[in-house]
């Protein structure tokens, strides 16, 4: 898309939602292919956000951390259903997945008319990811493997499989798989192509189901299925907490992030996994900025397409993630040096949990506009999944309208929602890092001193995130 809209009244970055005219919006099914708005400077938001994050740290330094830990440990049980329904829900999810694969292979070649790419990239990767931060580990019920696996177990498959994964693998397999997923999403030229996406999704389902049969469901999904690992980590931020019981499960409430403070330290590969999750969504925004395109010698007003930039983008994705990992490691090392700590591995494994609200905030801010627009395309595609002229739900309209988000006032709300998410995510991260640092060091003074470098990093990343939202983009 070559259109560039100039807004001179307000500082705003809203992606594909502001393409005029009002009648309909051209957009791609993949969230990363967003529209472009040239903006007025947003330095006031950046300065205000950085000040808010820094001020939250100063307030925490003045307050005793023990009440914060006690508050985070509070739990309130709200329900104890006599059954969990996991197998049934998962099997239904598998059937929906099979229908989506069929639609991808035989339906429309248009990514905006085929439900498979819209479901994968908008409803699942955007919507379901955000839901995990609010509602808990929904993937435990919605994954398309658990139901078929339970059926296979009833037919005689050993519940624990036949083999065991070496403990030394840790999170290395899912780290590689998540990087492959990020490559497919951000670098591969056609991640939205329905037929190619159907082939990739089917191959991954077969690979995962074979692993589950060989190594058992828990053994495989805890270290070899990247979505299960990623969603389980995000779910620790949720205010809902589910625990299995002999007759079903117990559902309770907890403070947001309370489960992150109590989490066990991640091994180095788990630390790298979380940092890759943040680095990939950050690069998704960075790769289309005029700054990045200029750095790799591309005129942003003559964007050549993803297929010509595969080498540069895979390099950029790796450098972004390694830079973030290096900055995090340096911050943890500096903090441990300040307090005389010696267990750098444990410190990094605990403090990295404070990154989770930042990763979720970036996910919300970066994909919000795509969710609002492409979610409408998804509703239309679901009414005619096989491109046969159906209108199952009365939503199969020829054009998706986005009048709901057009205009200066709507743009103002979108921008402020994005900025609030970035700032709020970093403030919560500072609070969690303070509680984790107290757990790590055992005294308020050592916790504040050890957390200081991490806070500096978070302040800097707040400014970077707000810059990503406001800087001109192309592609």
Annotate the PLM regions.
Residues 1-29:
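N-terminal secretory/membrane targeting signals
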Residues 29-37, 44-255, 283-284:
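Transmembrane-helix bundle segments that line or gate the permeation/cavity pathway
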Residues 281-290, 325-334, 358-394:
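Transmembrane alpha-helix/helix-exit interface in multi-pass inner-membrane proteins
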Residues 315-334, 348-371, 414-430, 458-462:
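C-terminal substrate/ligand-recognition segments
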Residues 465-475:
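Juxtamembrane boundary at the C-terminal end of a transmembrane helix
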């Amino acid at each position: 898309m070559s259109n560039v809209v100039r807004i001179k009244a307000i500082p705003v970055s809203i992606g594909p939602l502001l393409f005029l005219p009002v009648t309909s919006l051209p957009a791609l099914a993949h969230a990363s292919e967003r529209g472009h708005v040239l903006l007025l400077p947003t330095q006031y938001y950046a300065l205000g956000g950085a000040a808010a994050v820094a001020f939250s740290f100063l307030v925490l330094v003045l307050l005793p951390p023990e009440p914060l830990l006690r508050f985070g440990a509070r739990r309130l049980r709200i329900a104890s259903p006599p059954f969990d329904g996991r197998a049934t829900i998962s099997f239904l999810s598998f059937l929906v997945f099979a229908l989506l694969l069929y639609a991808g292979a035989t339906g429309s070649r248009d990514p905006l008319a085929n439900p498979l790419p819209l479901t994968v990239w908008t409803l699942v990767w955007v919507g379901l990811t955000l839901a995990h931060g609010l509602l808990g580990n929904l993937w435990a019920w919605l994954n398309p493997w658990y139901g078929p696996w339970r059926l296979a177990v009833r037919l005689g498959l050993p519940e624990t499989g036949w083999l065991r994964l070496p403990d030394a693998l840790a999170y290395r397999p899912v780290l590689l798989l998540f990087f492959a997923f990020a490559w497919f999403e951000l670098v591969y030229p056609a991640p939205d192509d329905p037929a190619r996406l159907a082939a990739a999704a089917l191959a991954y389902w077969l690979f995962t189901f074979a692993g589950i049969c060989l190594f058992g469901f828990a053994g495989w999904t805890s270290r070899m299925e990247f979505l299960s690992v990623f969603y389980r980590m995000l779910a620790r931020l949720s205010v809902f907490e589910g625990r299995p019981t002999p007759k079903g499960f117990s559902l309770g409430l907890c403070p947001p992030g309370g489960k992150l403070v109590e989490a066990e330290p991640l091994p180095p590969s788990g630390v790298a996994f979380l940092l890759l999750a943040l680095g990939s969504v950050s690069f998704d925004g960075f790769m289309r900025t005029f700054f990045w395109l200029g750095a790799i010698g591309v005129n942003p007003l003559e964007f050549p397409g993803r297929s010509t930039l595969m080498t540069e983008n895979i390099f950029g994705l790796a450098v972004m993630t390694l830079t973030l990992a290096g900055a995090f490691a340096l911050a943890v090392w500096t903090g441990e040096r300040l307090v005389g700590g010696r267990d750098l591995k444990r410190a990094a494994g605990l403090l990295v949990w404070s990154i989770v609200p930042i990763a979720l905030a970036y996910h919300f801010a970066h994909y919000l506009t795509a969710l609002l627009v492409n979610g409408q395309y998804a509703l239309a595609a679901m009414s005619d999944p096989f491109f046969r002229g159906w209108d199952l739900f009365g939503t199969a309209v020829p054009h998706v309208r986005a009048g709901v988000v057009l205009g200066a006032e709507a743009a103002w709300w979108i921008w402020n929602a994005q900025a609030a998410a970035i700032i709020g995510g970093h403030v919560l991260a500072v609070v969690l890092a303070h509680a984790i640092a107290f757990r790590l060091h055992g005294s308020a003074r050592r916790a504040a001193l050890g957390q200081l470098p991490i806070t500096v990093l978070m302040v800097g990343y707040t400014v970077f995130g707000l810059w990503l939202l406001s800087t001109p983009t192309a592609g």
